[in-house]
């Protein structure tokens, strides 16, 4: 850790600070690093913005998301709240309002400085704003309140200021109280990291404890606070809030001195313009809020219009940075360049996402340079086939030129996602076309590299040119491209991006994959295609469809396509539709003009996507027209073989019959799919169109089909927006959502006016034809849009059938109104999409998995075709065409197109243009938004909401081949998702939007170590958590959203986990009517925490500790906040359910093999406890339960325990109610009739680490007993089942030979009639077996040893008790005194009988221990001492006998056996006399020069009105070592007696006396001061010990003084009497190295809080223990306390406040040392 000076110096050179959590340090970036980020924001008006990004270093994973919202506001407040993670940095910037000028720009770069102090980082990440003046205009300030003109006052303090430390420590101690269990578990795993004793004092003080926290160094504060795993999730926000509440602003000072200053700054909205370009930390005002752990992105909300708040997160040096541009409304041009000057390492992924929402009419022209390849200034349109280098992921940061859209490259994993918002103004012409290689002529459509396309709008194809159809564009052959992992991009070749958005990922095989398609669509003036364009995978930026795009015919509002003239071949549509052309794209050979796309050998035709809206598209591309069909010319031609006149695409290899949508490259099959993303592996997934997404499916290279995007709704160009490339693009957003209303009435997204005519998709009414969806890899798809087939063509029919009207075999589709023959994809009449769209299949294209699953139909959605189609993946063998699935469209929507996108998300309900929106590429895109969501209601009936659910349908969203998805970085991000099939997600999963597992579907979460669902999780089918490995860590599963609803099955199986499983179910609403089954870690029981629930199904837990009702600690909830159980809760394999909150209903808790712990039995109502095996029902004596708790199956072997001394026990044979009395409280249990009242007794044991009193039964249960006592022969299974040792109390002493261990199957073989029955069992010792009498009472001691208590039954003359065991057997003495078996043995046993009596009679316990043997060897045998402790009250005396092993002594000669002395203590009161006998070991004579170990015995007696309680504690004396025989250590005994009206209280404390010393250095000494304070309630006396000044010596000795101890007595009195505490602390040893005199150090007063009255728990404290300790600031803390805390399987997590107070002293000792 840096020293303070270094940390302060480092702060001036760092833009970002490192954060530490549990020892994990993240590196921070320094300014000197190679990567940089520029964010520029322009205010409204006509402004030009330029931003550049240079990536000069190899990068690791950088995921950033920048979102800027520009609106009519004049200012933008931007806040950057990046999160940091060890492996990735994802940042998100949001700007709302209008943009703020450059002031918001931030640079963050630099290589990270490792090992920066976690302290600096903590504050930096927390609420630390580095306040600087440089680089900002005078009017800019940071941290202002939302009001634009409001002035704020803050006090600036150093992070090291004691006031800041006190606030932090206050939060820390409060959090410790609220989450006691977590701190206990954490401390157990970090026992070497002690806490300052001040924390202990503050923890114990429930008042104003802050004064106890002074004096703790800043470094110590840092270690404690940042060292816990919940620092960033709980402590950080709480500390930030606490500092803010006190008006404290923290900053790293320039010197080590701590200063504070106050300043007031304000700014007005109009002055927040500045174009500062900060290059150092001082130029940035940041309010950083780093998030913890990897891959967490946070997006900060702008706080006000008037201020610039930027919060920057460090990007690690290895990460690339992003650039964000914000444009406000009005006319703004954006020019952006992305220069990648170095190859991104193959392993790296650079996801970035920029979203800009702008209002009307902005035209932007983007000039992105090639991604992975060399940088260049040429516009993306001119680049086609870049040779990408090996970098697996080509990142196109290009801002797609889409009209308003800004670019939003976002690459969540390996994929690049784009999520532009609806764009408004797109200029036609340039945008769509782009091709590397040759330029496109003015025509809108893309041109292709290779040869240029003539003026016709449509794209040209490289290799051969495509005739005029816009859509098509494709580079030569694509096949070779390997896939980049999830992401869309292709490795191998670069993707040129034909369209602006196209961005081609390298996918095209060698050349670009891209499908121009998207761009194709054209509405009157706008080139939708372009926006759609996005290239396959890559496209991150992609944006919008042209929605607002232009007004055609002037009269048309943006987005409206109505007046478009067919004009350009591809896109033209009369009326509003976009021509199909866009969809088409071709690789390898050219596609003929037809939209649908044709595929040449390998490429997928883009045509698919195209759809037509409104009127038919002109003959040009695919489109057919409703009414009349387009002649063959329209359709594509195919290289390889051409398809005859049918509109639809033709396919090379085999041709598809005319369906436009289909396109496929013959060869394409090879492409492997990339898992996660939709994309295809090998080939790119061009997926040009949004939905299409088709991942790489297209043949090798262009897997993509433009199709999807194509569809057009009346007004918006869906295709374009959809565009996003397949897999990749996740973010993609909207299709023209904003788009506009077409025909006035039509909202964007609506397809209402589309005429079927166009080949690819046309839908009558509103839907787009299926074409878009289809795309195929491998071979061409048959005529029907949807279908495509690899290998051989599928006939149009394939895709399927459509409800409403069926598609003819030809293209599949029929058209409502008039049908287009084979013409491409089918069109759908009214509501249904023709099967085609959904269908797509690649015959051969096995690799392509289908996304299908995801598909779902929106409400009405086209008939089955969709759904069924979804099958898609199933379809021909492998291909996943999935398009279908998503495709479905409800009546109005364009199914085909939308379907197109693989991703299920696509579907859109009527109004929205699903295709486009769906767009997002398949699986990937998690972020994806909605397509048009805002869009509009088309047909009013469907709202964007529909999309949502459909969207993503998991499958599509994540599906890859085999319907499984994994991510290269191990994390899968889910968008809003509905899973309707079987889907497997491998690795960590994070879902920040709603996830639904539909009925009949199954989601399998495989091998992930963490799952987080922070939005709704609804399980109507099956959700399974599984592991495929033999060893794995426990899973962290967190559900914290609004709703957690289970009607199906939620099952987790991980019993072999090597660490504790942690499941947290804390949603706002938790409802289970299905089956939730958790089988968690065995080695350390799993932990389950949940908020109040409503259960009408079943909860089944195995190996779990459950804490219900409170997430923030063991606090009782209000009655209105409890849970309702009307189902079953099953506890098995040691599971313990700790219930703190009220539970009502009419449910059942089945204890199969576990424990139920009730803290408030009176609030446990309507529930029945059923014993189905061994277990414990434990109750805290907090309040009487007015209604008996029904208990079924009680036999005495399964037990009921009260965690306080039971003074009386009674049984009502008429009602079957067993009642235990404790003081004034009663606890009743309805166990049923048939029991004998004389068979009940109470025994002491432990539960959850504390003493408990067990209600036992040893009598006969009548055969007529009620169901509550169904076991006919209680004890039939005998308590001493094999493992239990009869004489367990002997514990380790006879370990290997202990007869107890050899108890053989105990079966109740004998019942003694006529009197309370006892049970006999057979014990085997050596070679002899004996039958003895035992009870069924089994308990556990503080060490976790299980033993059986043997008892006698006074009223039976035939009852016998074990007296001894030896090689001849275990012997009993009958009531007549005769010995049943003669004892012949070298070993002997002693028996101690302890009897406790009350009004119901006496309870006798017999404990057998091995007696010491005489020995003639030179080594004495092990011996044992027995101490008897008796406690008496009005009800009688309770005696306990404890046996401990004596140490062995070693001697060269035979020594005499050890001897013992016995002391008898008698106390008498009105009830009689109580006599105690204590045996202690007497000193042995020794002939050696080493004295043997000795023990001292201290007797402590406490008296009150009920009598006296005496305890005897034996402790080992330390050995002494000397060259000569020295006198043994001696001890002094102090007796303290305090008397009041109630009598006297006497305590005896023994402390070790100082030893003689031969050193010349005196030990440290301490002074003791007694402070007494009195008030009306009495006097309170405190004793404070402080260190005295050290003595110095100029000499140095070789030996040190022995340890000495001081004793402090503290007495506190109140109306109830006085409480005296005696504390012994160790005096530190003197050191012989002292050579200089030092001043007396500061002394501190330590105050102990009131502890509970002495109880038997104090026996758990050995040696000197105390909560009081001294702590010198000039030296390391001196530990003076020790302690023990006993837990049983973590059950202590359930101790309530009352029980916890009794253990707090022990806890403090254990936790803080």
Curated annotation (Swiss-Prot):
Gene: AWA1
Broad class of where this protein is predominantly found: secreted
Maturation and modification: The GPI-anchor is attached to the protein in the endoplasmic reticulum and serves to target the protein to the cell surface. There, the glucosamine-inositol phospholipid moiety is cleaved off and the GPI-modified mannoprotein is covalently attached via its lipidless GPI glycan remnant to the 1,6-beta-glucan of the outer cell wall layer.
Residue ranges, compositional bias (Low complexity): 256-275, 374-939
Carbohydrate-modified residues: 34, 1133, 1241, 1278
Any further remark recorded for this protein: 'Awa' means 'foam' in Japanese.
Ranges annotated as biased composition (Polar residues): 276-327, 359-368
Keyword check for Membrane: yes
Biotechnological utility: Responsible for the thick foam layer formation on the sake mash during the fermentation process.
Region feature (Disordered): 80-117, 256-327, 359-939, 1582-1603
Listed GO CC annotations: extracellular region; fungal-type cell wall; fungal-type vacuole; side of membrane
InterPro entries, per database record: SRP1_TIP1, Yeast_SRP1/TIP1_CWP
Descriptive protein name: Cell wall protein AWA1
């Amino acid at each position: 850790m840096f020293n303070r000076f270094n940390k302060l110096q480092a702060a001036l050179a760092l833009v970002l600070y490192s954060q530490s959590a549990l020892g994990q340090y993240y590196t921070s970036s320094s300014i000197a690093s190679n990567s940089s980020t520029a964010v520029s924001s322009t205010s409204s008006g006509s402004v030009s913005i330029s931003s550049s990004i240079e990536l000069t270093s190899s990068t690791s994973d950088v995921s950033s998301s920048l979102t800027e919202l520009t609106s009519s506001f004049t200012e933008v407040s931007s806040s950057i709240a990046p999160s940091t993670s060890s492996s990735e940095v994802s940042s998100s910037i949001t700007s709302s309002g209008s943009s703020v000028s450059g002031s918001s720009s931030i640079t963050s770069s630099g290589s990270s400085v490792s090992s920066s102090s976690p302290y600096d980082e903590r504050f930096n990440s927390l609420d630390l704003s580095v306040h600087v003046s440089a680089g900002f205009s005078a009017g800019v300030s940071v941290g202002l309140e939302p009001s634009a003109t409001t002035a704020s006052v803050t006090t600036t303090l150093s992070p090291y200021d004691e006031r800041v430390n006190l606030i932090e420590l206050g939060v820390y101690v409060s959090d410790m109280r609220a989450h006691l269990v977590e701190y206990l578990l954490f401390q157990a795993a970090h026992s070497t990291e002690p806490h300052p004793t001040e924390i202990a004092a503050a923890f114990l003080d429930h008042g104003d404890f802050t004064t106890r926290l002074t004096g703790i160094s800043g470094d110590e504060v840092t270690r404690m606070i940042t060292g816990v795993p919940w620092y960033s999730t709980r402590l950080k926000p709480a500390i930030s809030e606490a500092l803010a509440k006190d008006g404290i602003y923290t900053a790293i000072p320039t010197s080590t001195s701590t200063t504070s200053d106050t300043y007031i700054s304000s700014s007005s909205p109009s002055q927040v313009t500045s174009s500062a370009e900060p290059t150092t930390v001082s130029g940035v005002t940041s309010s950083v809020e780093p998030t913890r752990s990897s891959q967490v992105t946070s997006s900060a909300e702008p706080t006000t219009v008037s201020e610039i708040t930027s919060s920057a997160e460090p990007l690690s040096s290895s990460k690339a940075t992003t650039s964000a541009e914000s444009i406000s409304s009005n006319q703004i041009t954006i020019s952006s360049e992305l220069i990648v000057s170095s190859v991104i390492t193959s392993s790296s992924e650079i996801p970035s996402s920029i979203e800009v929402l702008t209002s009307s009419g902005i035209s932007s022209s983007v000039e992105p340079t090639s991604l992975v390849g060399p940088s260049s200034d040429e516009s993306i349109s001119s680049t086609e086939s870049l040779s990408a280098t090996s970098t697996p992921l080509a990142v196109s940061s290009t801002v797609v030129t889409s009209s308003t859209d800004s670019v939003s490259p976002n690459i969540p994993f390996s994929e690049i996602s784009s999520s532009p918002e609806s764009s408004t103004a797109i200029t036609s012409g340039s945008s769509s076309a782009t091709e590397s290689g040759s330029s496109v002529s003015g025509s809108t459509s893309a041109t292709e590299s290779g040869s240029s396309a003539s003026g016709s709008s449509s794209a040209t194809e490289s290799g051969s040119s495509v005739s005029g159809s816009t859509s098509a564009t494709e580079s030569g052959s694509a096949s070779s491209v390997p896939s980049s992992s999830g992401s869309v991009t292709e490795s191998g070749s670069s993707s040129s991006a034909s369209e602006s958005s196209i961005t081609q990922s390298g996918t095209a095989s060698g050349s670009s994959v891209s499908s121009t398609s998207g761009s194709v669509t054209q509405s009157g003036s706008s080139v939708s295609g372009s926006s759609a364009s996005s290239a396959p995978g890559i496209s991150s930026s992609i944006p919008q469809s042209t929605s607002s795009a232009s007004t055609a015919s002037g009269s048309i509002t943006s987005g409206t396509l109505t007046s478009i003239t067919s004009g350009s071949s591809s896109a033209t549509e009369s009326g509003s539709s976009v021509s199909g052309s866009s969809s088409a794209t071709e690789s390898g050979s050219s596609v003929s003009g037809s939209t649908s796309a044709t595929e040449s050998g390998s490429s997928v035709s883009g045509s698919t996507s195209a759809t037509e809206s409104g009127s038919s598209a002109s003959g040009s591309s695919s489109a057919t027209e409703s009414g009349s069909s387009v002649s063959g010319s329209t359709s594509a031609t195919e290289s390889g073989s051409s398809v005859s006149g049918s509109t639809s695409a033709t396919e090379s290899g085999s041709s598809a019959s005319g369906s436009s949508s289909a396109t496929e490259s013959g060869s394409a099959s090879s492409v492997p799919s990339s898992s996660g993303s939709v994309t295809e592996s090998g080939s790119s997934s061009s997926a040009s169109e949004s939905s299409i997404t088709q991942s790489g499916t297209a043949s090798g290279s262009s897997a993509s089909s433009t199709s999807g995007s194509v569809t057009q709704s009346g007004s918006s160009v869906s295709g374009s927006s959809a565009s996003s490339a397949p897999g990749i693009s996740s973010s993609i957003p909207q299709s023209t959502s904003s788009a506009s209303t077409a025909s006035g009435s039509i909202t964007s997204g609506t397809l209402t006016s589309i005429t079927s005519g166009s080949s690819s998709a046309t839908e009558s009414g509103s839907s787009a034809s299926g074409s878009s969806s289809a795309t195929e890899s491998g071979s061409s798809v048959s005529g029907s849009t949807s279908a495509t087939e690899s290998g051989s063509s599928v006939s149009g029919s394939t895709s399927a059938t459509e409800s409403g009207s069926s598609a003819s075999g030809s293209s599949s589709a029929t058209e409502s109104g008039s049908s287009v023959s084979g013409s491409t994809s089918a069109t759908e009449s009214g509501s249904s999409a023709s099967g085609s769209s959904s269908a797509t299949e690649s015959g051969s294209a096995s690799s392509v998995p289908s996304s299908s699953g995801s598909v779902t139909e929106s409400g009405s959605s086209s008939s089955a075709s969709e759904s069924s189609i979804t099958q898609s993946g199933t379809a021909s063998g492998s291909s996943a065409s999935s398009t279908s699935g998503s495709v479905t469209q409800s009546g109005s929507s364009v199914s085909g197109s939308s379907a197109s996108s693989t991703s299920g998300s696509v579907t859109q309900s009527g109004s929205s243009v699903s295709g486009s929106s769906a767009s997002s590429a398949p699986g990937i895109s998690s972020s994806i938004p909605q397509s048009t969501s805002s869009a509009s209601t088309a047909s009013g009936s469907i709202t964007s909401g529909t999309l949502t659910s459909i969207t993503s349908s998991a499958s599509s969203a994540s599906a890859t081949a085999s319907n499984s998805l994994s991510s290269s970085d191990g994390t899968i991000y889910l968008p809003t998702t509905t899973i309707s099939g079987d889907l497997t997600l491998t690795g960590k999963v994070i879902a920040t939007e709603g996830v639904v597992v539909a009925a009949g579907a199954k989601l399998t979460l495989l091998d992930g170590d963490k799952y987080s669902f922070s939005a709704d999780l609804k399980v109507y089918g099956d959700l399974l958590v599984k592991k495929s490995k033999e060893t794995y860590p426990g899973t962290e599963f967190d559900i914290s959203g609004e709703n957690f609803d289970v009607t199906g099955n939620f099952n987790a199986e991980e019993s072999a986990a090597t660490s504790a499983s942690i499941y947290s179910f804390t949603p706002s609403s938790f409802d289970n009517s299905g089956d939730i089954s958790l089988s968690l870690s065995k080695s350390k029981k799993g932990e389950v925490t949940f908020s109040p629930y409503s259960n009408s199904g079943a909860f089944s837990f195995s190996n779990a500790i459950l804490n219900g009702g409170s997430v923030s600690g063991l606090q009782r909830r209000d009655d209105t906040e409890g849970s309702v159980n009307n189902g079953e809760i099953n506890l098995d394999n040691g599971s313990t359910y700790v219930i703190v909150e009220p539970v009502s209903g009419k449910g059942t808790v089945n204890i199969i093999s576990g424990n139920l712990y009730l803290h408030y039995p009176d609030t446990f109502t309507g529930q029945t406890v059923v014993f189905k095996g061994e277990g414990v029902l434990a109750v805290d004596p907090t309040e009487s339960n007015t209604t008996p708790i029904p208990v079924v199956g009680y036999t005495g072997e399964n037990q009921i325990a009260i965690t306080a001394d039971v003074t009386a026990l009674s049984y009502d044979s008429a009602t079957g109610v067993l009642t235990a009395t404790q003081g004034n409280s009663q606890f009743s249990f309805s166990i049923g009739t048939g029991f004998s009242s004389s068979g009940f007794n109470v025994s002491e044991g432990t539960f959850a680490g504390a003493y408990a009193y067990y209600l036992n039964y040893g009598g006969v249960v009548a055969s007529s007993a009620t169901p509550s006592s169904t076991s006919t022969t209680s004890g039939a299974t005998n308590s001493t089942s094999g493992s239990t040792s009869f004489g367990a109390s002997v514990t380790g002493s006879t370990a290997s030979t202990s007869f107890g261990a050899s108890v053989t199957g105990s079966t109740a073989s004998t019942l003694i009639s006529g009197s309370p029955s006892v049970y006999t069992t057979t014990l085997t010792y050596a070679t002899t077996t004996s039958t003895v009498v035992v009870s069924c009472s089994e308990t556990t001691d503080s060490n976790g040893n299980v033993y059986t208590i043997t008892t006698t039954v006074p009223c039976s003359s035939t009852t016998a008790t074990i007296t001894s065991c030896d090689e001849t057997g275990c012997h009993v003495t009958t009531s007549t005194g005769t010995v049943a078996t003669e004892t012949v043995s070298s070993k002997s046993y002693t028996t101690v009988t302890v009897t406790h009596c009350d009004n119901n009679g006496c309870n006798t316990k017999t404990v057998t221990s091995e007696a010491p043997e005489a020995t003639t060897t030179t080594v004495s045998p092990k011996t044992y001492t027995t101490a008897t402790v008796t406690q008496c009250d009005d009800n009688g005396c309770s005696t306990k006998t404890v046996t401990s092993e004596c140490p062995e002594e070693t001697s060269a000669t035979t020594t005499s056996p050890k001897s013992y002395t016995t002391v008898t203590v008698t106390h008498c009161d009105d009830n009689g006399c109580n006599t105690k006998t204590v045996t202690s070991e007497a000193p042995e004579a020794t002939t050696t020069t080493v004295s043997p170990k000795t023990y001292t015995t201290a007797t402590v007696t406490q008296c009150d009105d009920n009598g006296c309680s005496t305890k005897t504690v034996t402790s080992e004396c330390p050995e002494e070592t000397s060259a000569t025989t020295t006198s043994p250590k001696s001890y002094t005994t102090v007796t303290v007696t305090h008397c009041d009206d109630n009598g006297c209280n006497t305590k005896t404390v023994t402390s070790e006396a100082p030893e003689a010393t031969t050193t010349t250095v005196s030990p440290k000494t301490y002074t003791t001061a007694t402070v007494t304070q009195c008030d009306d309630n009495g006097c309170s006396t405190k004793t404070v010990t402080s260190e005295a000044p050290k003595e110095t010596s100029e000499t140095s000795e070789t030996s040190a003084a022995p340890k000495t101890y001081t004793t402090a007595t503290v007495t506190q009195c109140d109306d109830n009497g006085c409480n005296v505490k005696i504390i012994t602390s160790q005096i530190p040893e003197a050191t012989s190295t002292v050579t200089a005199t030092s001043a007396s150090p500061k002394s501190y007063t330590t105050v102990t809080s009131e502890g509970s009255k002495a109880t038997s728990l104090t026996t758990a404290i050995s040696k000197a223990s105390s909560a009081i300790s001294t702590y010198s600031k000039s030296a390391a803390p001196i530990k003076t306390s020790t302690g023990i805390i006993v837990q049983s399987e973590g059950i202590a997590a359930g101790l309530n406040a009352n029980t916890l107070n009794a253990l707090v002293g022990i806890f403090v000792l254990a936790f803080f040392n």
